[in-house]
Structures are given as C-alpha cells and as structure tokens.
Regions:
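Surface segments flanking catalytic/ligand-binding clefts of nucleic-acid enzymes
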Residues: 44-188
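Hydrophobic alpha-helical segments and helix pairs
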Residues: 1-51
Length: 188
C-alpha cells in the first residue's frame, strides 16, 4: 500500500509514518492496554500531538488486517486526561473489567481547602484508585502521598492503592475494586 499525502512526514531527514498512521500500525504488535497507553500519550490534553477525533478517523482510513478489532476497541477507550502509561493500562483493566464509569485525574476538593487529583475516580461512590509507581517511594513524595491520602480519607473518600504487581493480576484487582465499590454503595 502506498501512503497517501499526510500519511508520512520527514523527521531528521527520514520519511516516517504520521502519528495517526503509526498508532494504527502499532495495533499489530501491542496488546490493548499498551495500545491505549500509546494513544493516550498522543492525545494528552496538555500537549496533544493529535486529537482523539483524528485518531478515530485514522482507524477508518488505515484498516489493518491483524489487530483491527483491537485498534477499534482502543480508539473507544482513549482519554486525553490520562497522565502516564501505567495509569492508562490500569484504566483499561478497570473499564474492560466491567466496573462503573471512571474519571481520570479528577480534582477533588477537601473540607480543609486543599484540592487533590485522583488517578481514577468513581465520583458517585467516592472511591479513588491510585497507581503508585516508584516515583512515589522517595521520602518527599511518600510524605506528600500520605498527607494527601489522609486528607481524602478524612473527607470520606476510599483510596485504593495499586502498583505494578497488581496490574499482573487483573481479575483479582477488578474484584478488589468491585468489593470496595459495593461496600460504598451499601453504605449510602
């Protein structure tokens, strides 16, 4: 297939695929969570490389035989508010696990006047799922996280902390989140 105008660009003297076309091509090699993470990076709200609508159009423009269903599924899961690949992968596990709708990086006010962002927020149930990477284990980050989580819990938010090990057991992770959501539903 010969690339159409706009499908490629010159980068450092080499002709390369456009971001939209490259994302479609990656569907052959990447699993759904990784493909969504790559797409979220491209559409990230603060510094977007391309818009969600443009990626969705690319899915129709660049049909792929292998990975086509995965590509269409990934396009429907993109979120411009995701801020890390692991956060995107966690969101894919949550969404495909059949849990209620979740909002990425929602600002949450507290009674003390502080505002904190939750990685994945089930706003109606006041449940936050936080991905804790190694970045959070330094002394200063750890202290800030403790204060943030304590203040959120004091404002009747449940905070579920997740790490890389949890992503390796998605069924157990979804079940754990579901139990907390169910308890929060009963207590309302």
């Amino acid at each position: 297939m010969t690339p159409a105008r706009g499908d490629t660009a010159i980068h450092r003297g080499l002709r390369v695929s456009s971001p939209a076309r490259m994302w479609c091509e990656l569907s052959v090699d990447l699993a759904l969570p990784e493909l969504v993470a790559a797409g979220d990076y491209l559409v990230q709200w603060e510094f977007p490389i391309i818009g969600i609508d443009a990626l969705s159009e690319a899915v129709e423009r660049y049909p792929v035989r292998v990975g086509g269903a995965r590509l269409r599924h990934a396009a429907g899961l993109l979120d411009a508010h995701s801020e890390s690949p692991m956060e995107s992968e966690l969101r894919v596990i949550v969404v495909t696990g059949g849990l209620p709708p979740v909002t990425a990086n929602l600002w949450i006010p507290t009674s003390s006047g502080h505002r904190y962002r939750g990685d994945l927020v089930f706003e109606g149930r006041r449940v936050i799922v936080e991905y804790q990477s190694v970045f959070h284990f330094g002394p200063e980050a750890f202290r800030k996280d403790m204060t943030r989580i304590s203040r959120l819990e004091a404002n009747v938010w449940a905070v579920i902390q997740v790490n890389l090990d949890d992503l390796g057991t998605p069924i157990e992770l979804v079940a754990r989140i579901r139990r907390v959501l169910d308890r929060r539903q009963l207590s309302r």
